[in-house]
Amino acid sequence: MKFNAFEEKLQQDLHQYLLSMNEVDNHMPECPDVEERWEQIAQTYLPDGIREFNDYPTASLGWMMYIGMAVAKYWDAELLTADANNRSLTDNIYAYMRDKRGYDHMDEYIREEVLLLKGNEYTALEKLTGECASRVYNILRHQNIEPGSKEAFRAYVACLHQLYLTGMAVQLKRMGYHMEKMS
């Protein structure tokens, strides 16, 4: 399996879906401060995500989209800087969020306490994230990868990576950052 092509397929599917929902711009954003946190977040997330994947695959995948949104929100609020007051947030952002209510309720914590959503916005984001996770899971399942193999692990990480970047893109647009050509 060509992982770059697989990851690109995930990215294109998510982008087209979110574009149709007006949740992202034509051009996906770049935000190096958020993107550079991916590796550390993935390393800490993987033990939890892998453990949950067999029983709750869309939650295991979807939580990463919420994490991408939360990191973008923290970035916008300038809470990711080295001189930020909260060292536990800057040192291990995933563990910080997970430990607030536990892995199972991290989605609710992010929607309520980080993104400050209520009512229809809260429910709409839950549906949007669920649909994105389901789309990614569907693509993954159709790859004919042997479960538990090195290839399966790499594919799972690719799925998480695209959902993280997608979460970042959705949140950046929601906060008013638009990726459009300057005239």
Q: Across the structure, where does each feature detected by a protein language model lie?
A:
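Intrinsic-disorder/low-complexity detector
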Residues: 1-183
